[in-house]
Amino acid sequence: MNNTVNGTINFAGQIVAQTMGIEEGGIIVQRPRSAGLTVSVNGSETQNGYVQLGAVSEVQLANPGDRAMPHQFNIRVAGIPEQYTHALVFFEGGATVDAATGGLINMAEAGNVQIQLLNQQGDIVQAGSHSQLVSSAFVPVMDGEVYASFAANFCSTGHATPGNVASKVDYTLYLFELAA
């Protein structure tokens, strides 16, 4: 039995000018099926899950470090053999991750904005950083299932300018046998 699950989470949203209406965007979650495991995101057990990210006014992201619109997403894995007691979701670095901030780089036309990941406690998750490997990041396996909650929000790197926001991040869910 392989003790990891790998996948990619694609993010989409929109920064709108103050006079425009708010339209909806979303997070597309893609992940492979692992033999013997059922993987779902927000209850969707299809190959691609969808989590609403939404849109935000540029006014809410006027200054560097401003954050807006946190949206929760969950990763659930079922069918885990009982030998595994804990899991850890690690968001990988890569071409779409800002190595300095761990934020997800916008690949669309909105300016001065990244997507920031948050853990269940609301702390910033720096994709690609080993700072994710802390004891509070381990999620217990209960009755053969693990349920990991995260959030994603917009984060300004300067005065955000209108346009679409799109990025993605790869993740690996590791399964562990930890002594009590």
Which ranges hold each PLM region?
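Mature extracellular/passenger domains of Gram-negative fimbrial/pilin and adhesin proteins
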Residues: 1-180
